Amino acid sequence: MGRSDCCSCKFLVFTNAGFIPVELVLKTPDPLILIHLIATYPQKKYIHIMNFDLSKAATFGVAGNFTGHLEQAGEAVDFTNIKTAEQNEPKAIFPTYIPLPDAAKNKENIIPDFLTVFPFSTSKIIYPKGEQKIQLEPECAIIFDAVWNNDKIEQLIPLSFGASNDCSIRKAGAAKISQKKNWGANSKGLSEHLIAIDSFTSNGILNKYRIASFMIRNGEVFSYGEDSAIRDYSYIYKKLIDWMINKLNTQKNEGPAENINSYLTAAGCPQKIMISIGATRYTEFGKTNFLNDGDVSVVILYPEDKYSFEQIKSKLEQNENFESDVSVLYQTVTV
């Protein structure tokens, strides 16, 4: 199983004064994305410490949660026969990685083998062999605790969020979305710097965050995705969680969608689930420029009450460090 090259991470201590960063270098012979979050909730008067190993979490993406993205990506036609209750409802949840417990076997090959390969990196994307076009997909990823009742998920409890690249192959003819998402180690990205979620509501921290994304090519910074507020996802907060629980439990194997519940139960009902909740629309540059060898893809989640988009782009152009309230993912493309 492939592993990420991550060997360091950051702590965030959440207090009445805001987020206070503490850095930790992990000494581990088998480098994992091991993210320690410390969140102090003043109203509860205790400190919550979480050790998180992404390679043991099931990971997913949400298709069609920003109006217009699927059309730009040339994927809207794939969902022609997928019925939704609302016009702006996302189309499907798709898997990007399903961990198998050490003692478990992939009984009856329920989980496609390629989905059991760990695809995440904090620093690079390796170009898929034989493919001509791959595209950055800038997203907000959320880490959840999953509460199970037998083989069904009853609750998804949001823990933290961070910048994510749901990098995708652009080609026609793939039977399932997941076939364009995981082509092996170093095919996806999650920032090593996650931020604790205080409340997954319009009153919580996420409501002031925005998603910006860029391509750095030959030293020049280009805006890649439209600068977008997380609150402007078509489905967000309770509505999104209710929808995701329903899809994780009941989504059928039809069209580009897959039976997610069968994968999760075959994997032993993972306690941690990471979901990238949808890619933003592209700028004109992003629509027409695919990732090439040596390009650097950048996804940044930042609080709009502290920074403007112009300030974020300027800091990137000047190669300045970002503050602890910003989640950043840099990935260099390697052929």
Give a label for each model feature:
Residues 6-9:
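Cysteine-centered motifs
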Residues 55-266, 311-335:
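Glycine-enriched loop-and-adjacent helix/strand subsegments that border the catalytic/binding cleft
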Residues 262-291:
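A conserved acidic, glycine/proline-rich C-terminal tail/linker
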Residues 277-279, 298-303:
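Conserved "cap/hinge" positions at secondary-structure junctions
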Residues 285-286, 304-315:
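Short, Lys/Arg- and Gly-enriched loop/turn segments at beta-strand edges
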Residues 293-295:
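Loop/turn positions that initiate beta-strands
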